[in-house]
Design a protein with these regions (language model features):
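Bacterial Sec-dependent N-terminal signal peptides
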Residues: 1-26, 235
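Charge-biased low-complexity segments
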Residues: 21-235
Length: 235
């Protein structure tokens, strides 16, 4: 009888292992970024195991693990040169590391009704913390870059002549409230309002800006360029 139960246990274990068998698939995220995704062999729509986003063959942008399509544990995010810029613990929903912000293409404008009154009382008492995009300053913003391509009515203009600015309005709750792309060319200027419903819930989530510890609204503006194929990107 004991042998029988042992046989049943081993059989169940083998079936379980078979059900969890995984494979790695590759998917192009942008022109230069490729995803390597571990998925269930029985259902490639379920991410299970190691995830990597890389530039070229070996420059990592993001690495972490999935458990049935849910990000788990600590994920690591890098800049395009492979330098670590952020760690985020998805299991405990906690930012564990954020590199010093030295970028000159990101600009922030805060909206705080009581900012002026605080400044008049004690300017040194103002402490502002910028909003943080989970995923870092490159990988985390890829979903927004992918939503815009050069409009057909502007095909006759060289892409390198455009001045492109992404404008993201982040609520005090850390939610993306509005996304605009501003194009400038000589005397021409037009703002394109992007439908944020195309984004996943994760792609609309930020750690909000704060003023003296109080969450506030903030607009992130990013200076970008337009590639020859009409996509927007930034260095």
């Amino acid at each position: 009888m004991r042998c029988f139960f042992l046989y049943i246990f081993c059989l169940a274990l083998s079936v379980s292992c078979l059900a969890q068998e995984t494979i790695v698939i590759k998917r192009r995220l942008t022109d230069v970024v490729t995803e390597r995704i571990t998925v269930l062999k029985s259902d490639i729509n379920i991410k299970q195991g190691l995830y990597q986003a890389v530039i070229g063959k070996n420059i990592a942008l993001a690495t972490g693990n999935y458990d049935h399509n849910k990000r788990t544990g600590v994920w690591h995010f890098f800049n395009p040169h492979g330098v670590l810029i952020q760690n985020f613990d998805y299991t405990h929903n906690h930012l564990t590391y954020e590199a010093l912000d030295t970028s000159s293409i990101f600009h922030y404008a805060i909206y705080a009704p009581d900012q002026d009154s605080i400044a008049k009382k004690d300017p040194a008492a103002i402490r502002i913390i910028r909003p943080i995009r989970i995923g870092g300053k490159y990988y985390g913003y890829i979903p927004y870059l992918r939503l815009f391509r050069r409009p057909k009515d502007l095909y006759d203009i060289d892409t390198d002549r455009f001045l492109v600015t992404i404008e993201l309005l982040i609520s005090p709750l850390g939610r993306l409230a509005e996304y605009n792309v501003r194009l400038r060319f000589l005397g021409f200027e037009k703002v394109y309002h992007i439908d944020i419903n195309q984004l996943s819930d994760d792609d609309k989530t930020f750690i909000p800006a704060t003023l003296n510890g109080k969450p506030i609204m903030c607009q992130i503006s990013i200076n970008c360029f337009m590639s020859n194929d009409g996509q927007i990107d930034f260095d």
